[in-house]
């Protein structure tokens, strides 16, 4: 990025399809950003591109223009069926795929192109029906698309003439590289297919992928004075763990009304921080892997509309999402990866705007700071944690935004969101027949929890009796239960026998599990009546003979004894 995010190059100066130019102008795009001005002269004639540019520089529009212009100006491959896609755009995360699809529809709705958005976490059958009907462009995450290609043969990529890999470095981080190679092998060979690759960093592994599956790609790098956005004002505080929430509330109270994102490292802290902010009167949304996909989309949409003041998220929202007007980004937890820091603060100061990036370096995550400063090649200014900042200012009455009343009635509180998420996850695990929690699941606590703590429901809906571990040589449980009354009655009438007869019954070995005796693994009940115990015999006392006493009573004295007697005889003169 630079202080001048737009160049003097206009989209109309390129040989674009007239309908595409009209769509760009109607969407408000007239001049190119640096990455767009570098990419389009290479991509429009059909060349492969390996582009490096930071987030928020307009990479999405660069490859969307190249894809749509190719599909509008060039005929499809000869062996293409009407339902086969002509272009594939791959993104590492669902949120990024949704954002790309939204931008594509924004200025490409009137071009006659059919778009399909494919990602996990939503209705599988609806996406399959859409693909079977036929589309021109698929915008997808690798996992769900491979499921359609590999397992169900829903879609074929043999006629895909252009492929885009967005955030390629993130693909490696998330372990998608094998999936990417699998999909590229199902497309036309690289001499026929055009491939556009974009990444925040063109590392060795990214370039290796480019040269392996691309046709002599041209490496394009947007030179910047700094890796981070020039208009981001960065500062860092060093609070203790106990001061972080109070400091966050104090800083938020001094920036009332500003659209804010708060990043944390774990899903558990998303819920904890969001609950704290909600208790203090803030309207909060959450983005993490625990939140269902539909709810994530709804919360993100409300945040973009201004119905939510703060969005608390993990790194799932750190890349690719373009949210207008984000003024503050808080790193509540410093990220472990320096690149994640750059992508987090890239949510603000996009396309020439200004913003603030505020980080907390507590004792738990402060060790990441040297790597971050080395990566961005600058020292982050340090601000002191004062008692004034730890005191939140009184909040002014907030003017409600249109649509907030309906959302309040829907009950989209943080607690409700996570409770519904846990219930939905438990229901899905039960529906799949597995899982360690929920009814019938196998949890060690709760009613109906599994073998140890409760019985699962039978075919008639009634709870089954708990099944005891079977011991080797033991009769079946049902037979043993039916014999218990008979055995008890016979035992009462049986004559007494000696203890020796009772001891002749075979002993059953007690099985052990994980070093602990299995509960209920007692010796099996004999099929014959159990004899009543005989009267106890008087115990026999066994007296051990001391060793020295035994030596004294023996006929042969010890060596020391013989020496002693010899000395005494010499002294006495005998």
From Swiss-Prot:
Annotated Gly residues bias: 435-449
Listed Basic residues bias regions: 506-515
Compositionally biased intervals (Basic and acidic residues): 423-432
Segments of skewed composition (Low complexity): 477-495, 523-535, 553-562
Residues annotated as domain Helicase ATP-binding: 40-220
Example of a GO biological process term: RNA catabolic process
SUPFAM superfamilies from the UniProt entry: P-loop containing nucleoside triphosphate hydrolases (SSF52540)
The Helicase C-terminal domain, residue ranges: 231-393
Reactions listed under catalytic activity: ATP + H2O = ADP + phosphate + H(+)
Keywords: ATP-binding, Cytoplasm, Helicase, Hydrolase, Nucleotide-binding, RNA-binding
GO MF annotation list: ATP binding; ATP hydrolysis activity; RNA binding; RNA helicase activity
Primary location group: cytoplasm
Enzyme superclass (EC): hydrolase
Region (Disordered) location: 423-574
Positions of short motif Q motif: 9-37
SMART domains: DEXDc (SM00487), HELICc (SM00490)
Gene Ontology CC, one term: cytosol
A Pfam family reported for this protein in Swiss-Prot or TrEMBL: DEAD
Domain of life: Bacteria
Function of the molecule: DEAD-box RNA helicase involved in RNA degradation. Has RNA-dependent ATPase activity and unwinds double-stranded RNA.
Family, similarity comment: Belongs to the DEAD box helicase family. RhlB subfamily.
Quaternary data: Component of the RNA degradosome, which is a multiprotein complex involved in RNA processing and mRNA degradation.
Protein's UniProt name: ATP-dependent RNA helicase RhlB
Gene name for this UniProt entry: rhlB
């Amino acid at each position: 990025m630079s202080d001048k995010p737009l160049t003097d190059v206009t989209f109309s100066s390129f040989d674009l399809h007239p309908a595409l130019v009209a769509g760009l102008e109607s969407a408000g795009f007239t001049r190119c950003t640096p990455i767009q001005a570098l990419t389009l002269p290479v991509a429009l004639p059909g060349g492969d591109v390996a582009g490096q540019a930071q987030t928020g520089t307009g990479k999405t529009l660069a490859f969307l223009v190249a894809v749509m212009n190719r599909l509008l100006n060039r005929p499809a491959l000869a062996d293409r069926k009407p339902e086969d896609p002509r272009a594939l755009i791959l993104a590492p995360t669902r949120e990024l795929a949704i954002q790309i699809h939204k931008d594509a529809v924004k200025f490409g709705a009137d071009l006659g192109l059919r778009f399909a958005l494919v990602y996990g976490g939503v209705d599988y059958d609806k996406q399959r029906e859409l693909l079977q009907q036929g589309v021109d462009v698929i915008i997808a995450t690798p996992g769900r698309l491979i499921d359609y290609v590999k397992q169900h043969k829903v879609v074929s990529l043999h006629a895909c003439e252009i492929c885009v890999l967005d955030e390629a470095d993130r693909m490696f981080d998330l372990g998608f590289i094998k999936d990417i190679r699998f999909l590229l092998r199902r497309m036309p060979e690289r001499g026929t297919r055009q491939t556009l690759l974009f990444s925040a960093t063109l590392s060795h592994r990214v370039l290796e992928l480019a040269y392996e599956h691309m046709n002599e790609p041209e490496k394009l790098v947007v030179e910047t004075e700094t890796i981070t956005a020039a208009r981001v004002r960065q500062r860092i505080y060093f609070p203790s763990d106990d001061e972080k929430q109070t400091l966050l509330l104090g800083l938020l109270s001094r920036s009332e009304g500003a659209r804010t994102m708060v990043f944390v490292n774990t899903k558990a802290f998303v819920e904890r921080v969001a609950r704290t902010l909600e208790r203090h009167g803030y309207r909060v949304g959450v983005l993490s892997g625990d939140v269902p996909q539909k709810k994530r989309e709804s919360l993100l949409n409300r945040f973009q509309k201004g119905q939510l003041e703060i969005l608390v998220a993990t790194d799932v929202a750190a890349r690719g999402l373009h949210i207008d007007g984000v003024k503050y980004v808080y790193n509540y937890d410093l990220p472990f990866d320096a690149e994640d820091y750059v992508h987090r603060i890239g949510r603000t100061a996009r396309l020439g705007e200004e913003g603030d990036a505020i980080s907390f370096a507590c004792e738990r995550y402060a060790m990441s700071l040297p790597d971050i400063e080395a990566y961005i090649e600058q020292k982050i200014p340090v601000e002191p944690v004062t008692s004034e900042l730890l005191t939140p200012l009184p909040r002014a009455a907030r003017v409600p935004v249109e649509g907030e009343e309906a959302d309040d009635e829907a009950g989209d509180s943080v607690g409700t969101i996570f409770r519904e998420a846990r219930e939905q996850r438990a229901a899905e695990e039960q529906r799949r027949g597995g899982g360690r929690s929920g009814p019938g699941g196998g949890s060690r606590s709760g009613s109906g929890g599994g073998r140890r703590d409760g019985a699962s429901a039978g075919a008639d809906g009634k709870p089954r009796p708990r099944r005891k571990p079977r011991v080797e040589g033991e009769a079946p449980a049902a037979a043993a239960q039916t014999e218990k009354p008979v055995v008890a009655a016979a035992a009462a009438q049986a004559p007494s026998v000696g203890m020796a007869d009772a001891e002749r019954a075979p002993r059953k070995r007690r099985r052990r599990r994980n070093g602990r005796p299995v509960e209920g693994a007692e010796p099996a009940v004999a099929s014959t009546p159990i004899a009543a115990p005989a009267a106890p015999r008087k115990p026999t006392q066994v007296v051990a003979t001391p060793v020295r006493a035994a030596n004294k009573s023996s006929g042969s004295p010890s060596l020391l004894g013989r020496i002693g007697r010899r000395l005494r005889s010499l002294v006495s003169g005998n």
